[in-house]
Structure formats: C-alpha cells, structure tokens
Amino acid sequence: MSLITLTTDWGLTDHYVAALKGELFSMLPGVNIVDISHQIPAYNFMKAAFVFKNAFYFFPPHTIHLICVDKQLNRTDDTHTGWMVVQYGESMIVCRNNGFFTLVSKQEPLKAVYIEGSEEVSVAHEKSFLVTLLHDLVHNKPLEELGQP
C-alpha cells in the first residue's frame, strides 16, 4: 500500500485539492493520502520547506511526498521552472526545481532527476501531469525514465 503526502499553497476553499485526491484515488486504488498542509502562503516555498521539513522525518520509508508550491499560473515571463523528483533515503520528494530541496536537507540526495515543465500553464494540465507522475512513482518506474539527471 502506497503513502503519498501533499503540501500545497492551494488552500481549501475550492475544488483543487479534492480534484487531485479524487484522481489519485481513481488511478491508484488503495493509496493512502496524508495532507501535511494546504495553507502555505501563495508561492512561499520557504514556508513550505519549513512545514514539510518538520513533518517529513515522521513518515515511514517509501513515502512519496508531493510539494506544489511556487507555481504561479498564468505567468508571462520565462521563470517557469520544471519539476524535480528526488530520492532521499527510501522516500521520494516531488517538488519544483526552485531550490526547495536544499532548504529541506543539506545532504545530497541518492538520486535526482529534472522533468521539464510544460508550456501549457493550467491547473487541469498540472493536475494531470502530477497524477501521472505519482502513478509512475507508486509503480516503481525508474527515475532515469522519468527525467534527466
């Protein structure tokens, strides 16, 4: 049985978190999802790192952690960052390539891959991308097949 944690700046006043969870439950029957927080101030990946770091070490090995912070939709500049999948110990951390992981740990990860962000910027597209990525991680797809080292 897989365990996925969610840390986002999406809040709880609309449908976004529920839609992500619904799609995860549909694609991954039996998965357990734990909310670390959805009340991170918008785009504040430093606060997200603080909250996540203080919860991360209490989760069992093989947990997959998804951090969705620092993704400003409808940006018109080219500061759009891709995603990182970081193997830290026996767990996986999925986060933006924005320095988040370096705020969580000073240790080098066992493995890390970069996944290029899409040109399409929408919540629906991001949700679909993340659900597919989490599906691949739950089914132990090698990191090297997901992105570039």
Where are these regions (language model features)?
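Histidine (H) residue identity feature
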Residues: 15, 38, 62-65, 80, ...
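N-terminal auxiliary interaction/assembly segments of multi-subunit proteins
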Residues: 35-46, 148-149
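Anionic-ligand-binding alpha/beta catalytic cores of soluble enzymes and soluble regulatory domains
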Residues: 116-149
